[in-house]
Amino acid sequence: MARIRVTEYLDLELDDERWRCRVCDHDLGSARENYKHACQINQRDPREIHQPLIEAEYTFAPDPDWVRIVEFHCPGCFTQIETEYLPPGHPVTHDIEIDLDRLRERLDAGELEIRDERLGSTR
């Protein structure tokens, strides 16, 4: 199986075009779709992470009316795969979109190769 490490905790299984958790190998959906939709999603009040630094009207802590910390966890092992700071109600972002067809073409043509689960140039 051809596997590519995309992020610290996210792999691309190229043969079956699936996202996989790097820790527990949980299937996170089609690599042609947003892996985040298969994740456990938790929204946190930013004040839980960024404690107010001073007792005043402006505390240097993010305002929860303006921002939420959105965490994406693997549903298999609960490893945190991604974190985003988004306005409340903002849709889930689609931050990784790989052109799988072009990637396969370049691998087949020998322009790229997979070494130790990393994508590398042959030139």
Where are these regions (language model features)?
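Short, intrinsically disordered terminal segments enriched in charged and Pro/Gly residues
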Residues: 1-12, 88-123
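Short cysteine-rich clusters marking metal-coordination/redox-active sites
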Residues: 21-25, 74-77
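Short recognition patches in nucleic-acid-associated and regulatory proteins
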Residues: 1-8, 22, 26-63, 86-88
